[in-house]
Amino acid sequence: MSIPTASLSPALAALIERAVARVRQSLPAWQVWPGGDFDRQLAQVALASDFALDTLARQPALLQHLAHPDPPPLPLPQLDPAQPQLWPAQLRRYRSAESTRLVWRDVLGLDSVEATLAGATRLAEHCMQCGLQALEQQFATRHGKVIADDGSVQRLVVFGLGKLGGGELNFSSDVDLVYAYPQGGQSDGARSLAAEEYFARLGQQLARLLDEATAEGFSHRVDLRLRPFGTAGRVALSFAGMDQYFQREGRDWERYAWLKARAVAGAIDAGEAWLETLRPFVYRRYLDFTALDGLREMKAAITAEVARHDCLDDIKRGPGGIREIEFLAQSLQLIRGGREPSLRERRLLPALRALVTAGQIDQENGQALTTAYRFLRRLENRLQMLRDAQTHALPQAPLDRERIALGLGYAEWATLLDALAPQRARVTAEFAELLAPRVRATAPDTLADYWRALPAGDAARLAGMGLSDPGGAHQALADFAHSSGVRGLSDSARARLDRVMPALLHAATRASQPDAAVPRMLGLLQATLRRTSYLSLLDEQPSALARLVDVLSRSALLAERLAAYPLLLDELLDTRISGPLPDRAALHAACADIVHIDDTEAALRELNERRLARSFRIALATLDGRQQAVESTRQLAWLAEAVVQTVLHLARTEMVAAHGYVSGGSFAIIGYGSLGGMELGFGSDLDLVFLYDHPPEVDASDGKRPLEAGRWFARLAQKVMALLAAETGAGRLYDIDVRLRPDGGKAALVSSLASYREYQRERAWTWEHQALVRARAVAGDAVLCDAFAQVRRYTLMRVRDTAQLHEDVRKMRARMRTELDRSDAGRLDLKQGAGGLVDLEFVLQAGVLGLAAQQPQLLDVCDTPALIDALVQVHWLPDDSAASLHQAHATLVDAGLSCTLDRRPRLIAPTPAIQQARGTIFNAARVQRLTFPLGKDEAAL
């Protein structure tokens, strides 16, 4: 940016001229003044920074470095352990020179705002690391090194909090440091010290080395007040001491402080590892709207401070300032970061991007906040670059205002203010929206009075509110109000419950099934009272409250799942919930991502939580009518196959670690039944068959504890089953049924490919080939999955006697009807009853088995809708039957899923639509001379 001399006031022009002249005069006789465009560049820097020109006058050798078109970072100072008296000057000269380079690059437009902030952060880290390294050598000479009980050498860990931790340090910022060390112990030198004293002294000397003002100025202002117990606490704590503090004493504001924490010097790897253990304190496992309480308290304190010191022009702490953007992003991170790892971002701008991606900030607001943040941080840096002052206040002096405005490209101060005002206004609006009291649906005062009077309330207050049994509802509410969970609530939690309860009651009495909504609502509250974050959620998010009651009243299954796994409440808030549901690839990606978690138990819990969340979304979409039940069952099958693939990866990893691998071997998991046919229900078990293959010359695994090859694969299958059925804090993944394997329950758990092929060829019953029609490989090695597909194809393409085939199919259907059909005179078993789903499956399977030898394309699909289309295309089913069969199938699946969602048996009084569906299926069977038993309501069909 060029500044025409005519645009400068006389006073400013004279100031710049004097500053440049002073730098010229400081140049040694032997040093050549840089040529080219250097004078103009120096004038621009002089406009923006007295500090930079003062540094150049003291260190003229820096001029040649800055004359480079793209001046690189300066070399780090080398602190001689033998000359500690020189360290302060060396660090300060380095800091001044490198800071001047940052000014130069910023003013001349060589760096973005982010690059300048990152540069200031690296500078602080380098100074700390150089200083600490020199001090460690000095301490080792005097006191030795600290040795823990296990013999390991201990080092100080320097944690950087705030902007230092986030890599966003402003130009003249202090640095928030916390000192810690991994373990206690004693130093091994002549003047031995206990670890606590050793590291406290080391930390204090580091702070003094950086912070103390000398003739050369200072390196960095150090603030140690964010350590545990503040100024009353120890200067350095062991990791165990830190753990104890945060478990017992940690406060809400400290979660904000430690969100950005990073190990910046000393034993960095140990520090980063410890920060992982602190993560549950910062990011609660569940949705945590209590974070807003801490934010409101901090905001109130800052607002009071701003008013007390008349800091409205403070672009950091004042209205619409940097702090509000940081608090807004951090609060949303704290609320959801425990559930969404992508939100655990130390840096502000990446955090905003992650929040937009996660749907917590919309695209427009995210961009507006990003723009405002960059504007404010650039202005903040320029305010501080002027004189290396830790200021955030807009200047009052006319000359300073002129310099700041011109340096940022504005013709005058008023123009800069005009640009600043809308940025701050937008930030203020967004921040106020976050903390604004939520607009709740107004509940009658009588309900609030009724609730507060419980358990002595008057049941008559519930009369006329749509309840068929107000007395029963009153007793349930009174019992809840008198329960130990409610009586044991803290004052703040009780206040939240008192705000939420009338609204919940009002919504429940207006629900489609109020008599179901009330007990289900109380069951959920009873299960979540110990976690006040859920009360906070309902208090802070009235839309979630209304949505919750609606779901509870309509689905007993979802009510049970919410009570058992309250983390699912997040799904009621997620803005993505009403959008398109994840496709197959997205479901697989969501599950596969957990394989990076080292701990199997933690991985299973995370996998289960993801399965629960996505299953819940599918259920909501079904309940709301946003998608057909057939599509929901397909998505549930995709989700299950993704889970099985992930579990196989975990199981295989454990097996290889323990026993090595069977070289050249392969393993596959075959999905039968509703999983294979991609028609899985909520809570359905998985019908699985395990196959393996290996070269004949390889008879064992290659690990330190080898296993015979067949036994290795059997162990792998057992481990897969154990992991799928393992109980975690989020329940178990799936129940498994392996009875469809060759020879059923009396056979080995796993089958070799050769034995499976032989069984299907020589010994399998017709009903087993029927089951094979819907079977598909859902996980495992591609080579074996392909081999299974070939066995399936070969088996099903066998030429069959049609009459014998139909007889076998009819007999098996009759046997199943006798054993499994629960229909009675007034109700139909949707799955096993006459004209039900299994009848349709048997018709389609008979068609495939009878025709596949001539029409092998029938074997390319295995799900009911695709099989209907395939059999119509080869004219086995009438050409005009496709639409009616699809509708019949969809009607029965929808009715069955509706029963499951409300925890009713799939045994219903047939509606006209159900009867029509049954008639369609019966006619399809009759056309193919498959006369299945009709059951007790034959006349209706």
Swiss-Prot record:
GO terms for molecular function: [glutamate-ammonia-ligase] adenylyltransferase activity; [glutamine synthetase]-adenylyl-L-tyrosine phosphorylase activity; ATP binding; magnesium ion binding. The keyword Nucleotidyltransferase applies. Its cofactor is Mg(2+). InterPro entries: GlnE, GlnE_rpt_dom, NT_sf, PII_UdlTrfase/GS_AdlTrfase. Residues 444-941 are annotated as: Adenylyl transferase. It catalyses: [glutamine synthetase]-O(4)-(5'-adenylyl)-L-tyrosine + phosphate = [glutamine synthetase]-L-tyrosine + ADP; [glutamine synthetase]-L-tyrosine + ATP = [glutamine synthetase]-O(4)-(5'-adenylyl)-L-tyrosine + diphosphate. Residues 1-437 are annotated as: Adenylyl removase. Keywords: ATP-binding, Magnesium, Multifunctional enzyme, Nucleotide-binding, Nucleotidyltransferase, Transferase. GO terms for biological process: regulation of glutamine family amino acid metabolic process. GO terms for cellular component: cytosol. Disulfide bonds: none annotated. It is an enzyme of class 2 (transferase). It holds the Pfam family GlnE. SUPFAM superfamilies: Nucleotidyltransferase, Nucleotidyltransferase substrate binding subunit/domain. Its EC number is 2.7.7.89, 2.7.7.42. The keyword Magnesium applies. PANTHER family: BIFUNCTIONAL GLUTAMINE SYNTHETASE ADENYLYLTRANSFERASE_ADENYLYL-REMOVING ENZYME (PTHR30621:SF0), GLUTAMINE SYNTHETASE ADENYLYLTRANSFERASE (PTHR30621). Belongs to the GlnE family. Involved in the regulation of glutamine synthetase GlnA, a key enzyme in the process to assimilate ammonia. When cellular nitrogen levels are high, the C-terminal adenylyl transferase (AT) inactivates GlnA by covalent transfer of an adenylyl group from ATP to specific tyrosine residue of GlnA, thus reducing its activity. Conversely, when nitrogen levels are low, the N-terminal adenylyl removase (AR) activates GlnA by removing the adenylyl group by phosphorolysis, increasing its activity. This is Bifunctional glutamine synthetase adenylyltransferase/adenylyl-removing enzyme. It comes from Xanthomonas oryzae pv. oryzae (strain MAFF 311018). The gene is glnE.
